[in-house]
Amino acid sequence: MIDKSVFIHPTAIVEDGAVIGANAHIGPFCIVGPQVEIGEGTVLKSHVVVNGQTKIGRDNEIYQFASIGEVNQDLKYAGEPTRVEIGDRNRIRESVTIHRGTVQGGGLTKVGSDNLLMINAHVAHDCTVGNRCILANNATLAGHVSVDDFAIIGGMTAVHQFCIIGAHVMVGGCSGVAQDVPPYVIAQGNHATPFGVNIEGLKRRGFSREGLVAIRNAYKLLYRSGKTLDEAKLEIAELAEKHPEVKAFTEFFERSTRGPIR
């Protein structure tokens, strides 16, 4: 079903079965597959390809040569009906690629809302990107990566498969991330190592002075105390009982499979 208010350029191809919401815009030379859903007000600028079982929300801006929902690059993939879901108000810039999931990884690649994916960023199969994240130019997520809310990944940075990038993290450009990055941390290098707490970012997001002190204390326990990881986890858990901001660390430890960067 295509709403009557949708603009479709004469050179675009929208296949039968596609669902496009009110006031969407399908620009020149775009291709929209038969299983695609596009929400109200979303704009495909030009030369955008969206195919597979892909659902895109409202008011997104998708720029030329982006490819969304294409067959993933996992050699085990055998054409199973896997999906891509994208939320609302994202800006997906030129030549971004977002691949469909695999059955081994849950079958879904998911991007939340209010994100900025800059030129040539890549989101591989089974990745989850939260809300209000930034992937700078040429940032690359391998399969099964999780990027939590408000994270920023610098240009030319590559993230190893199955890694977690915690909430409010900033990863510097040209880095190689091979382990999980705890929330609030600045990471840089190849392999990426911790360089302190993302204090300026947290201030901009309204964290209290007390909360910032607690986060710094958790960081010091993890990286500067000389304690083993297990010892640091126990003390951080105690700190989290008094300071809710620190709970992000304990939740991160529960999810982490590759271990935190050191």
From Swiss-Prot:
Pathway: Glycolipid biosynthesis; lipid IV(A) biosynthesis; lipid IV(A) from (3R)-3-hydroxytetradecanoyl-[acyl-carrier-protein] and UDP-N-acetyl-alpha-D-glucosamine: step 1/6. It is an enzyme of class 2 (transferase). HAMAP family: LpxA. The gene is lpxA. It comes from the Bacteria. GO terms for biological process: lipid A biosynthetic process. This is Acyl-[acyl-carrier-protein]--UDP-N-acetylglucosamine O-acyltransferase. Its EC number is 2.3.1.129. CDD domains: LbH_UDP-GlcNAc_AT (cd03351). It catalyses: a (3R)-hydroxyacyl-[ACP] + UDP-N-acetyl-alpha-D-glucosamine = a UDP-3-O-[(3R)-3-hydroxyacyl]-N-acetyl-alpha-D-glucosamine + holo-[ACP]. GO terms for cellular component: cytoplasm; membrane. GO terms for molecular function: acyl-[acyl-carrier-protein]-UDP-N-acetylglucosamine O-acyltransferase activity. Involved in the biosynthesis of lipid A, a phosphorylated glycolipid that anchors the lipopolysaccharide to the outer membrane of the cell. Its main location: cytoplasm. Belongs to the transferase hexapeptide repeat family. LpxA subfamily. It is found in: Cytoplasm. Keywords: Acyltransferase, Cytoplasm, Lipid A biosynthesis, Lipid biosynthesis, Lipid metabolism, Repeat, Transferase. Pfam families: Acetyltransf_11 (PF13720), Hexapep (PF00132). PANTHER family: ACYL-[ACYL-CARRIER-PROTEIN]--UDP-N-ACETYLGLUCOSAMINE O-ACYLTRANSFERASE, ACYL-[ACYL-CARRIER-PROTEIN]--UDP-N-ACETYLGLUCOSAMINE O-ACYLTRANSFERASE, MITOCHONDRIAL-RELATED. InterPro entries: Acetyltransf_C, Acetyltransf_C_sf, Hexapep, Hexapep_transf_CS, Lipid_A_LpxA, Trimer_LpxA-like_sf.
